[in-house]
Swiss-Prot record:
PROSITE patterns named in the record: HOMEOBOX_1, HOMEOBOX_2
Bias-annotated ranges (Basic and acidic residues): 128-137
One Gene Ontology biological process: regulation of transcription by RNA polymerase II
Protein name as annotated: Homeobox protein ceh-9
Function as written in the Swiss-Prot or TrEMBL entry: Required for cell specification of the PVN neuron.
PANTHER family: HOMEO BOX HB9 LIKE A-RELATED, VENT HOMEOBOX
DNA-binding region listed in the record: 70-129
Leader sequence residues: none
InterPro entries recorded: HD, HD_metazoa, Homeobox_CS, Homeobox_TF, Homeodomain-like_sf, HTH_motif
Lineage: Eukaryota, Metazoa, Ecdysozoa, Nematoda, Chromadorea
Gene: ceh-9
Example of a GO cellular component annotation carried by this entry: nucleus
Provenance organism: Caenorhabditis elegans
Keywords: Developmental protein, DNA-binding, Homeobox, Nucleus
C-alpha cells in the first residue's frame, strides 16, 4: 500500500526522466560560447580571448610601469617633528581640525600627514594598553597622579 502511494507521488518525476528530450550539444568549447558572453566590438581571437588583453600583454615592462600609479613615498618625520607630535598626543589623543591645521603648519607637514600619524599612534597606544591589561598592569590612563 505504501509502495502505491510512493509511486503515485513520484510518477510525474519518472515521466521527466524517461522522456525523449535530447540534450542540446555545443560544438564549441570556447569560453565565450559556453558562457554566452557578448563580444566587445567583435574583438575576440580564434581562441575566444579578448584581443585588447593580448595587446596589453605585448607591452614592455617599461610601458607598464609608466601606466601604473606610483605609490607615494613613506613620510619620514624628523626628531623634532616626532617630539612635537608625541607631546601633542600626550596632551590630546584626538585633535580638532583647527589644532591639526595649526600643528601641521608649525611642523611644515600636511594636515593629512598629521591626521594619519595620530591614527597610527592611537592604534599603537591602544595595543600597548590592551597588552598591559592582559598582563595585569594598571593602564596609564587609570593611574592617579598626585598633584
Amino acid at each position: 500500500m505504501e509502495t502505491d502511494l510512493l509511486f503515485q507521488l513520484l510518477q510525474p518525476y519518472f515521466a521527466l526522466l524517461t522522456s525523449d528530450v535530447k540534450p542540446q550539444r555545443r560544438t564549441s568549447h570556447l569560453i565565450k560560447d559556453i558562457l554566452d558572453l557578448p563580444t566587445v566590438n567583435g574583438e575576440i581571437d580564434e581562441f575566444g580571448r579578448c584581443k585588447s588583453s593580448l595587446d596589453q600583454a605585448k607591452e614592455s615592462p617599461i610601458e607598464k610601469c609608466q601606466k601604473t600609479k606610483r605609490k607615494k613615498a613613506r613620510t619620514t618625520f624628523s626628531g623634532k617633528q616626532v617630539f612635537e607630535l608625541e607631546k601633542q598626543f600626550e596632551a590630546k589623543k584626538y585633535l580638532s581640525s583647527s589644532d591639526r591645521s595649526e600643528l601641521a603648519k608649525r611642523l611644515d607637514v600636511t594636515e593629512t600627514q598629521v591626521k594619519i600619524w595620530f591614527q597610527n599612534r592611537r592604534t599603537k597606544w591602544k595595543k600597548i594598553e590592551s597588552e598591559k591589561e592582559r598582563s595585569g598592569e594598571i593602564p596609564d590612563d587609570q593611574i592617579v597622579k598626585p598633584q
